[in-house]
Amino acid sequence: MRRYNLFCFTLSMFVVVSLLGGCSGGSGNKEGQQPPPLATTPGAILPDGNLQAEIQGVTINSRPVVTFRLLDENGAPLDQKTAGLSVRFFLARIKDDGNYENYVGDAAGFPSYDATGTFAALGNGVYTYTFATDINDATKTLKGITYSATDTRTHTAALQVSRTVASKTGASFQQARNVRFDFRPDGQAVTTTREIVAVSACNDCHGKLGVHGGGRRDTALCILCHNPDLVVGYDTNSSAKYDAAGVSFDFKVMIHKIHMGKKLPGNVAAITAGGTGYGIGNASYATVAYPLMSGDSKASGTPIECTKCHRHGTDSNGNVYGKDADRWKEAPTIGNCTTCHDTTTFDAAVRIDVADALATVNPGAGTISYKAQRRAVNPVRHTGDVGFFVFDETFCRVCHPAEVTGNNSYQMSITGHHTVLEQSSVYTGLNFVILSVADALPGRKPVVTFRITDNLNNALSPAAVGSSFALRLGYLRQVDYVNDGMGSAGQPLSQPLETATANGDGSFTITFATAIPTTATGVGVVGMEGRSTYTIPATQKYAARTVGVGGKSIQYFFDLATGSQVSDPARQRRISVAAERCNNCHGRLGASLHDASRANNTQQCVICHNPNATTGSGAAEQTINLKDFIHKLHTGENLALSGGSFTIGSKDFSKVKYPRDRRDCLACHVDGDPPRFALPLPANVLGSTTAVGADPNNAAVDDNVRTTPMKAACLSCHDNISQWSAIPQFGILVHAPGNAADANGAELCLSCHRTGLLQSPDLAHRPVR
């Protein structure tokens, strides 16, 4: 019997460790710094180790010959014949209109790659590849284009190399590298480029692009095929492959429509009419919620910040990229603008077609069927078309220059039409300073002196009409806020500031209406937050409107034993997440939450969203500890329990699709040695309260029901492993009702997941390059 129990325990340990070993994720990843190599199986690869490649030259007679080099993740020559290694080549040229056209097409007549040519080894990882496609033969090339040795147009050869390998953790991952080589057939220097969007900008949100199976990771490669020739028509095979009435998968069209998502007018119209909106393959993008946060509801959730993508950056190999990034504002065309404004018409049309339903790819008996659908909807007539002339896009810049002289915010310029409130001249700034906190002792009412200014250092009143400012006072006994005796479910004291007394020097003073509990010990905090209102001027589309913008919240720490300020970061609440990293996707964290009052500082969030905080007693009570609900919120559609359901109040986050690899903890967490997300957690981290017990104001472990701290962190993403909670050997998986030891960390996670082991989060959660 003992042998059987030991076997079952060992098997259970193996299964649980396997479940905890990694997260499923999207297509994107982010590079991280490599820690010292671990003692593991010889030849095993770190999960961010990547291949290296370069194109050294291109010669063309009839079939292009590319000279290239392949190296493995250690910089050693890589055999092109290595099992599982995929090597593909692309060749395209820039037309006079600035778009690419591809020489190579697939059987269905769509832009593609060449991979059936001939390789020759030159030694030291250097090879030549001779294309199978004769680009001097119009019957062999896409659309019959041919090559000329005297052509002055820019040509781009590109290489995609990839393979799937096993990492040190035992999981498989894909190594991939995309490289390009620009040249002119006439031998002169390249002067024309199409470097409009650098993949480094994409990777701010996506971590690491990886589409078409994960091997295509650079926008410089994407645009060679995703050009205006890639149009999917209604019918099958050749009859509609270039049909202008089809759905375009040109890069700018596709990317703009995907990111507009549920804010795309065509999607709104199509869904209202009973359709499904824009989609590709089996994926629908009609409900995508763009993550930009703004106090302007017209902009929030919309990719209005064009420079988020259209800016100088680097390609996937770290090379400077983006020479043409300003074309978004310098070259307006009907085609470009209607990728987002897709129901706008520039003529007298009473109906306009928008993309609707998914494009399908159906392999048949020797043929491939591409099909996409459109739906006629009511258009929005462009205000510049006054009806007495045929609108031509050469007129666009007459009304819509790239910029106007002086202030461009909300002007007719291209820049002005894409204004983000918090980056505009309308928002004059909102800055907080806590000058002092007196009487900050248990049983006393703290007296706080503070200042509010704009960006020109002008003093602002906390009682200004339309403004709302407040202080939050909480305390931590060890490393987490507890706020015992202050408010229901771990909430801090709150003090509005409109009644503060002016001191005559631009500062104000207020006394808390409620005293600090006499039982409070440790380190206290006063957090300052608030918003002011601003008026966005009327535009051609919207009437003038008043909106709220919050200033960046700040914190002042003090010793509850002495009342003196605590400036030592080691005694303050630990910093686990950097708001700047959140802003890579969100623009301005919190700008559209809590009436915009709590913005741009996660250290303010945790004063309320602490381990003792819940949604309140009741049947649906759950923790709102920051790590728990933020992990769940971003896991979204990948949650396993309750059919993937996750709601807080009236907000349903069950359909959230995170845009990058969720294993990439450094997307949000600050780095460190060891990383802040590594195990063990800091000493004395509290478990997350899931039920406040009989007394909502008492967070003591004999009253609250908690989930142990490491379990709480892991289950917020790995929510499907709660099936193991019935195994008593795993303290990590046992709910801890009122047990002090369990509630504060009696867990067995470290036996398998401590830093330095293969299944440690800092290794198992390291995303691939």
Give the label of every model feature segment.
Residues C222-I223, C337, C396-R397, Q603-V606, ...:
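Cysteine-rich micro-motifs
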Residues V17-I45, G49, G387-E393, R397, ...:
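Bacterial Sec-dependent N-terminal signal peptides
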Residues N29, Q33-P36, A44, E54, ...:
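Long, compositionally biased, intrinsically disordered segments
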Residues T41-T59, H418-L441:
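Low-complexity, acidic Ser/Thr/Pro/Gly-rich terminal tails and inter-domain linkers that flank the onset
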Residues E31-E73:
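Acidic/polar, low-complexity intrinsically disordered N-terminal segments immediately downstream
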Residues G49, I60-A331, D342-T345, A355, ...:
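Extended surface/linker regions that mediate inter-domain or inter-protein docking
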Residues G25, T343-T405, L435, G443-K445, ...:
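Repeat-solenoid scaffold signature
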Residues R2-G21:
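Sec-dependent bacterial lipoprotein signal peptides
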